[in-house]
């Protein structure tokens, strides 16, 4: 695995982790305010779920060295 490919995988993993943790935190806030009388555990639970999902995705990416994520290229019409 080349260094640039490894860097792309790390970048993708960190971006995925930020999105999933942020989404879990946001859902935790919503549930905390609406259902659980402003308790803190929904925030921790949502963030933990997001972190766990991101970790699982990163682990899968790094253990599949031959799986390359491609980009879609539009075919130009003539």
Curated annotation (Swiss-Prot):
Residue ranges that the UniProt entry lists as topological domain Mitochondrial intermembrane: 37-78
Q: Which InterPro entries match?
A: Mic10
Q: Which residues cross the membrane?
A: 17-36
Q: Which GO terms describe its biological process?
A: cristae formation; inner mitochondrial membrane organization
Pfam families, alphabetized: DUF543
Main role?
Component of the MICOS complex, a large protein complex of the mitochondrial inner membrane that plays crucial roles in the maintenance of crista junctions, inner membrane architecture, and formation of contact sites to the outer membrane.
The protein's name in its UniProt record: MICOS complex subunit MIC10
What organism does the record attribute this protein to?
Homo sapiens (Human)
């Amino acid at each position: 695995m080349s260094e640039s490919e490894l860097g792309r995988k790390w970048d993708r993993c960190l971006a995925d982790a930020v999105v999933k943790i942020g989404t879990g935190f946001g859902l935790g806030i919503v549930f905390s305010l609406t259902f659980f009388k402003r308790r803190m555990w929904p925030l921790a639970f949502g963030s933990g779920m997001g972190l766990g999902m991101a970790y699982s995705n990163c682990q899968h990416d790094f253990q599949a060295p031959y799986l390359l994520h491609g980009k879609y290229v539009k075919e130009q019409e003539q």
